[in-house]
Amino acid sequence: MLANDFGTTLIRLLLATLLGLALGFERECHGHDAGLRTHGLVSLSSAMLTLSALELAEAHQDSDPIRVVQGLAQAIGFIAGGLIFVRGGDVRNMTTAASLWMAAAVGITAGAGQYVLVLAGSLIALVLLSLLLLIEKRMGRREKKADDPESGSVTMPNRRGSTVPKRNG
């Protein structure tokens, strides 16, 4: 009876949104286009669809909420796949695509009321996104310069003022 419990519904939606915003904040801080709003909306919409599926399953016994989860996973996979591209032999935006997928998982688990799972998973995801970036930098993995003459690329400013590779030719 989630529809009759406005407080529970609101908590689940807010939790999904806030945790999605936390994931998006990390991406936004590093200049990625899929940032705060995108991650917040993906988490919120996933929670809403999950809550709706649970309501339908409760009202109609022949309804299967797992199909909504499967549909969300496919839809987010399609959107995330659109973010990924290859330039100069390097694959770009894999982490942003994965964090969008995580934002959907946050919304699904928050919408389902799995509070321990959503909080633990979000905490681990934030550690992966922030702490491991520091480790990658120390290992030199993130030290490639876009204006390196050997890479054959140059940079130009993007809408946030940071630089992005510009195609040659």
For every predicted segment, state its role:
Residues D33-L36, P65-I66, F85-T95:
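Short, amphipathic, aromatic/basic-enriched membrane-interface segments that mark the entry/exit
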Residues Q74-F78, T95-L100:
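Hydrophobic alpha-helical membrane segments
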Residues H60-I84:
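Alpha-helical transmembrane-segment detector that highlights a single hydrophobic TM helix
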Residues A97-A98, M102-Q114:
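Interfacial segments of multi-pass membrane proteins
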